[in-house]
Amino acid sequence: MNSELKPVKNFYRREIMLDLPPGSNFMYRQCNNMGFLAEPSCTIYTAGFDTEYTSDDVIVVGDEVSNTYLLAGAVTAYRSFTFFTLIKKAANQHKIEVRQPDIMEGETPEEVVILRGNDWKKLLEDYATIVAERNNLPKFGEGKNLTGYCTWYYYYADVTEKDLLENLDAMAKHRSSCYAADVVQIDDGYQTFQGDWNDQDETWPTPLPEIAKRMTDSGMRAGIWLMPFLASTASRVFKEHPDWFVKDENGNPKVSKGWSPPPDDLWVCLDTTIPAVQEHLKNVFQTFRKWGITYFKMDGLGFGLMDGKRSDPDATPLSAFRLGMKAIREAVPDSYLLGCCPPFMACLGYIDGARISNDTRACRSAIDHVTKTNFARWWMFDKFFRCDPDVVIARQDRSTASIGDNRLSIMTGIMTGVSITSDNLNTIAADRLELLGKSAQIRMRDFRPAGHWGAGCWPVAFSGTIDGRKAGAVLNTTDEPVTVKFEDMGLDPEQDAEELLQDLGKRKYVITVMPHDAVLLKQ
């Protein structure tokens, strides 16, 4: 009856006993990739008597009445991820179990830090600083906003060379306008099969080196999309080197179901513990680099953690993943590496930027979700890497989003300092182009949730600085108008503030924001 129940290997497990006030029910939870536990919120009310709640990489628990909080967070991820489970007993937050499933008992565990304090948001900010210092990460995002064009969110996989070149010309024409693009990036469509990244599909007649030169001659960096650790079973690289891939228990390449249409839908994962595979990765990126490409959108990174048999029996999926990332970084040290579907901790030190939300779309539900996911990870901004909020959307065509939805989307670029778009500048309306330009020209630094943010809800008020001056924002993703006092955004209620998104003029004391809309104030 229980023949399918298998014993669990004896991996690293520890527990943190909690001594919180009775009735403590607050928890902040995290996902270790760009997806997010977004509903009802990343802050939850831990109801129940004897039950469990999980979080990846970091967890905060505590009591909102007495402002007593404890944070536990992973500081390193060299061989294993760290998972946290809050265990409740008799309705109390009893203990946190710490699991590192790829660390065996007796092996050196990944480092974990425990912090205590009366401000859970400050604990997360302090935690991010500790991680950055421990991993010797550089300072990110000190210059101007990163701007550019990506084909995906307008054309998706149906993009043609003609589409790209028309948008390249539009971006070049507008470089002297309010939106000056730094990068033009091809996103899918150019390759023959997933995995054969340097093999150009015949539907793209102009060689990629010539396209890249046209981009750079226009004053922009040339960028490209690829999934470096994956190949489809239809690819040339898989057919020529089936021994290069992670294997299942029977010694066959292990297959996962991908999101691409057939015949590209069955994916295998490169075994990056094989030296020849590391050289293959280096060659792929160096070939692109020789063609003039210096911006790489590396997608599907989480698939590079496939469990299975590798050439090095001592490697874990995470340690093998980092070998691959190291090879790529060494191959193109002067290029910008953007991680998508990125396991955050495993990527530290190897990437310049990381997507921190799911894919967006030009509709309200997606923009709301992406907005919340991005501001919920404010503590990562410019500490782990440049946080990429996914593309900002201002366009009126191929869209069901309202102008208010667009302002929320634009705010994700302003808060992170990354403002890539897929909007077609040949068809965008003048007022929408002006709005898009704000995401390129304005950076709200020191961005953080302001006022009260309790369990089971989302904040609406945020504080920060713009050009060294006090700034506040209201991001209303609800179905009702919200009114926010200036002091709840860290602003002086007696001092005029200029509204920057809607051109509302000078305001003071309070501001009311309509449903699914945003305002940005600077004093």
Task: Report residues per predicted region.
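Acidic/polar loop patches that form or flank catalytic/metal-binding clefts of enzymes
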Residues: 180, 224, 334-341, 420-434, ...
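Glycan-recognition surfaces
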Residues: 239-275, 279, 319, 323-429
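Carbohydrate-binding surface patches
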Residues: 412-415, 420, 452-493, 516
